[in-house]
Amino acid sequence: IVTVTNEGNAELTQILPDTHIVIASLEKVVPTLEDATTILRVLARSATGQDMSVYTTFCTGPKRAQDLDGPEDFHVVLLDNGRTKMLGTEFHDMLRCIRCGACLNHCPIYKAVGGHAYGWVYSGPMGAVLIPNLIGLDEAHHLPNASTLCGKCEEVCPMRIPLPRMLRSWR
């Protein structure tokens, strides 16, 4: 398990409790440690311009006999929340999103209204595509229109997610 934070506060939540429970969405799972380190480098460069986030924590599971600290018990809960329904659809590329925020930083709508205006956990162009997939277009019908379709989000996306195309599809 790899955790990246902006303050290093997650490390304490991983080593102090006797039980460590990780809750992550399905798209956060990658096949190899090499894949994870590649994503970490891309994430830091796209989010903050750093080579690597200062606060990156690797957790290998429960404490072993030779370990000085760490949890006695370790559990991983993978959330779907509608994500597998995106597989095989025009929105499947959205599952590659690493939540770096590059699309938000370059979106003129996001710059004008901020993140809270989206009304959900995910904001900006990526949120305007992902949220309707997770909660349905009836409830999130306004989000795909929160874009000028200028394409800046796709230009800066390190995962090359075609956000404008997906926003047009929702519209």
Which residues does each PLM region occupy?
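Predominant activation on well-ordered alpha-helical scaffold segments within soluble catalytic domains
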Residues: E34-T37, G101, P164-R168
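Phosphate-binding glycine-rich loops and their immediate beta-loop-alpha structural context
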Residues: C97, G101-L104
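Generic hydrophobic, helix-prone segments enriched in Leu/Val/Ile
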Residues: L43, M94-R96
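Small/polar loops that bind or transfer phosphate-bearing groups
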Residues: A24, R99, P158
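Ferredoxin-type iron-sulfur electron-transfer modules in oxidoreductases and energy-metabolism complexes
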Residues: D67-M94, I109-R171
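The feature marks the mature, well-folded catalytic cores of soluble enzymes
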Residues: I1-T89
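Structural signal for hydrophobic packing residues in well-ordered secondary-structure cores
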Residues: T37-T48, L104-C107, K111, E154
